[in-house]
Amino acid sequence: TTEEMIETYDVNLISFNLLYNTIKPYLVDHAHVIGISSQAALVSQANAAHYGASKAGFSAVLNALRLEQPELKVLNAQLGPIDTPFQKNADPTLKYFKNYRHMMIQPQQLAKQIVEGIILNKIEINQPSWMQIMLKFYQLCPRTLEKLCPNLFKNKV
């Protein structure tokens, strides 16, 4: 619906910009800004266009912020599905959860990686890493992969 589309952009893109503009005067040099984005920013999926677009926009904002404000440490965590209660709440049928639980990131493991990323001044965390590699390949020849493996791009209900 139109309302869901607006909410998706509001939650995933607009809210960060509003929050950042509010806290910007209080940030000190070398402050860390951590953005939780999605691997969906790198791929087109049926029934998830606005989610992917909002996350792609968010990743672009984080990358631009890193360039515009070099005194900040900006970390973009581009993630696949995470094993949280959100998965069950978003799809009461649990179809997505059951189909993809085996590849879901564990929150405790992810938190550790983000803390390590902060300590090491990383600019990106991409998890799961195999998905990131696959999506880089997708970016080289998207239409070919969409034709050869159409079900990979139609997993959202």
For the regions a protein language model found, what residue spans apply to each?
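Substrate-binding pocket helix/loop in short-chain dehydrogenase/reductase
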Residues: T1-I6
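Active-site helix of classical SDR
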Residues: Y20, S54
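A short helix-coil junction within the Rossmann-fold of NAD(P)-dependent oxidoreductases
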Residues: T22-A31
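Catalytic Tyr-X3-Lys helix of short-chain dehydrogenase/reductase
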Residues: K24, G57, L62-K73
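Residue(s) in the substrate-gating loop at a strand-loop-helix junction
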Residues: S38
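Active-site loop immediately N-terminal to the catalytic Tyr-X3-Lys motif
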Residues: Q45-A49
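SDR active-site lid
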Residues: R66-S129
